[in-house]
Amino acid sequence: MSDSLRIIFAGTPDFAARHLDALLSSGHEVVGVFTQPDRPAGRGNKLTPSPVKVLAEQHNIPIFQPKSLRPAENQAMVQALDADVMVVVAYGLILPQPVLSMPRLGCINVHGSLLPLWRGAAPIQRALWAGDSETGVTIMQMDVGLDTGAMLHKISCPILPQDTSATLYDKLAELGPRGLLETLELLADGSAVAEAQNDALATYAEKLSKEEARLNWQLSAEQLERCIRAFNPWPVSYFTVDEQPVKVWKAEVITTAHSTLPGTILQADKQGIQVATAVGILNIQELQPAGKKVMSAQDLLNSRREWFVPGNTLD
């Protein structure tokens, strides 16, 4: 391989840890890891380290967990590591300009979309919900904007009709490390070419909210089915019936035309619970009532058939 690089890695969740793992298996030297402070998690609200911290500890890499990189003393932590490049993957903190300029080759970021599409916090989910036919990862040179830096490398993959955010996440978690290592090779031997983003083509992937997860029957069946896949595994689409929230994990589109009020139950049997939408019918196949496990429509009908009487409406 080309010359070994001294790398600072900054990341927090599992998606980031998979990239750190790839770096640790390469010929590069990870001289320090920045990750978010431990957070309360689980039933006992016990302080829990991030997946990136756990991996760094296993490899005895120096770990830094500042709450912010704005204070000069925290920026000095970065400077002292004398890195060639800083690799940032789902870190969760803003990098001020002084930090971006510290490593010899600057800071690069792995982003889960084909930039300039879906800049922002939830690119995987937004691409799926929008009905895009493909997505991918972009490795970019970071600047102070929100995912606006020049692009160094892209890898794309198709979005399949059955993909959920969970399955796309796994695909991109495989593509990202590969693209990262290829980009580092180009940076190390001086052959990387940076391509400016076309801001006119930019779209924004706002963070998901639980409020968005409520199924809006005024949308088409196609839109709702994509919403269900985009919000799997979090926050999970839902409707309410008898004032009870019911999560929806799987559904299919029936293109049959109808003139029924959206949200009306048309049919409920072992094939699913068919609900009228603005365009077409949504056939709900897997559901989860509050406090229960995920179950088939048939299993839920066995215990709660009164919830799904044809002619009734869902909220």
UniProtKB/Swiss-Prot annotation:
Alphabetically ordered keywords of this record: Protein biosynthesis, Transferase
Record field: transmembrane: none
One Pfam family in the UniProt entry: Formyl_trans_N
UniProt: (6S)-5,6,7,8-tetrahydrofolate binding residues: S113, L114, L115, P116
Xref: Gene3D superfamilies: Formyl transferase, C-terminal domain (3.10.25.10), Formyl transferase, N-terminal domain (3.40.50.170)
Top-rank EC class of the record's enzyme: transferase
One MF term in the entry's GO annotations: methionyl-tRNA formyltransferase activity
PROSITE patterns: GART
EC number per UniProt: 2.1.2.9
PANTHER family for this protein: METHIONYL-TRNA FORMYLTRANSFERASE, METHIONYL-TRNA FORMYLTRANSFERASE, MITOCHONDRIAL
Function: Attaches a formyl group to the free amino group of methionyl-tRNA(fMet). The formyl group appears to play a dual role in the initiator identity of N-formylmethionyl-tRNA by promoting its recognition by IF2 and preventing the misappropriation of this tRNA by the elongation apparatus.
Family: Belongs to the Fmt family.
Name of the protein in its database record: Methionyl-tRNA formyltransferase
Organism listed in the record: Pectobacterium carotovorum subsp. carotovorum (strain PC1)
Gene from which the chain derives: fmt
